[in-house]
């Protein structure tokens, strides 16, 4: 299975650092976030990687090269203008092939074991969900006892999308080149009953601010 890492964002909330450094190359305890993800993927047996980029993307290519230094292979999908999540994945589909692939947000840190991920026959997506963080208390989806993902419920019990998933290329059938979001495609597939999920109860941080980067460094220090 191949993996795609989304690395095209500008990292607005991490300014001024991201004015000169793309967010995936920001270091946590001396190692760039994206390098930590690639090493975790390799440990899980996933060593064929696709990375999209836009803002300061040449720095990402210069640092990671062809991936051989990390024990894998990297194909890049550069974007002249950011295409949002859905458009970026759609542009990269020729590099990903016709089989399901792993998808990771480039600014997430987690102890999730990627080797556990799979997509059941007939499903279009499998989402890893986490407890709602303080900055996103309402959550994104509901996970039922059978492992099926549904829309959020007013009664509560909702979870947050972790930025870790398995997608089938068929999710993008009918899409056209250009910028578009991933969420509407997922919600359409959810309505069709074709999205599964799991609840990761381990460590997970969406490294979107300097404060959350400090949290990751604290967690890494605890396990050093």
Curated annotation (Swiss-Prot):
Gene Ontology molecular function: any one: nucleotidyltransferase activity
Pathway given in the UniProt record: Cell wall biogenesis; peptidoglycan recycling
Residues binding substrate: 105, 140, 206
Annotated UTP binding sites: 11-13, 23
Coiled-coil portions: none
EC number(s) given by UniProt: 2.7.7.99
GO biological process: cell wall organization; peptidoglycan biosynthetic process; peptidoglycan turnover; regulation of cell shape; response to antibiotic
Phenotypic effect of disruption: Cells lacking this gene accumulate MurNAc 1-phosphate. Deletion of this gene increases fosfomycin sensitivity. Growth rate is not affected.
Enzyme class name: transferase
Residues the record lists as binding Mg(2+): 107, 206
Names of the cofactor(s): Mg(2+)
Keyword Chloroplast: no
Function: Catalyzes the formation of UDP-N-acetylmuramate (UDP-MurNAc), a crucial precursor of the bacterial peptidoglycan cell wall, from UTP and MurNAc-alpha-1P. Is involved in peptidoglycan recycling as part of a cell wall recycling pathway that bypasses de novo biosynthesis of the peptidoglycan precursor UDP-MurNAc. Plays a role in intrinsic resistance to fosfomycin, which targets the de novo synthesis of UDP-MurNAc.
Protein name per UniProt: N-acetylmuramate alpha-1-phosphate uridylyltransferase
Organism: Pseudomonas aeruginosa (strain ATCC 15692 / DSM 22644 / CIP 104116 / JCM 14847 / LMG 12228 / 1C / PRS 101 / PAO1)
Organism taxonomic ancestry: Bacteria, Pseudomonadati, Pseudomonadota, Gammaproteobacteria, Pseudomonadales
Gene behind this protein: murU
């Amino acid at each position: 299975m191949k993996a795609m890492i989304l690395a095209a964002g500008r990292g607005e909330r991490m300014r001024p650092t991201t004015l000169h450094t793309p967010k995936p190359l920001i270091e946590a305890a001396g190692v760039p976030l994206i390098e930590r993800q690639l090493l975790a993927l390799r440990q899980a047996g996933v060593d064929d990687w696709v990375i999209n980029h836009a803002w300061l993307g040449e720095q990402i290519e210069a640092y990671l090269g062809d991936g051989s230094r990390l024990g894998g292979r990297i194909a890049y999908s550069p974007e002249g203008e950011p295409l949002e999540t859905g458009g970026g994945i759609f542009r990269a589909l020729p590099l990903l092939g016709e089989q399901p692939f792993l998808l990771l947000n480039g600014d997430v840190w987690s102890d999730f074991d990627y080797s556990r991920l799979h997509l059941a026959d007939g499903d279009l997506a499998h989402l890893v969900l986490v407890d709602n963080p303080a900055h996103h208390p309402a959550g994104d989806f509901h996970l039922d006892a059978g492992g099926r993902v549904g829309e959020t419920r007013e009664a509560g019990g909702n979870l947050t999308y972790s930025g870790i998933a398995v997608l089938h290329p068929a999710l993008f059938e009918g899409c056209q080149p250009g910028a578009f979001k991933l969420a509407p495609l997922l919600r359409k597939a959810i309505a069709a009953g074709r999205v599964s999920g799991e609840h990761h109860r381990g460590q997970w941080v969406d490294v979107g601010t300097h404060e959350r980067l400090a949290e990751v460094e604290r967690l890494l220090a605890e396990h050093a």
